[in-house]
Amino acid sequence: ASRRGRRGAEHDARPELRPDVSTLLDVDREYRSKAASGALRTIAPRRFNPGKQAWLPVLHTERTPWAFTALYSNTARADELGTTGDWVVIYFERDGREGQCTVVTERSGPRAGQRVVRGREAEDP
């Protein structure tokens, strides 16, 4: 699925239009486990990769009725904070509706050290 045109879809609050937090955290767990074991295909990101090396693992998976693509965040902010190997961006699609979210390790508060879906911290997994 194309990443274009996804902006804004992740902010739609109707639950049927976005995966629940527990599903997203399960995709995050699968991605980080397979990435750590070297079981995923890698791609060469365009940004912050002057040598054009294929180092970024990519997961394509499904949890009916959702299709997911997960990869580590390769943004300037993630690079600056040293969280490239922690922040996981998950793209999702269902019935033509697309969106994305970011899963991170919470650094403070009652959920410090836990994986959370950024922007949906108040939702129980």
Segments (PLM) and residue ranges:
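Structure-specific DNA junction-binding interface
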Residues: 8-125
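Helix-hairpin-helix
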Residues: 1-7
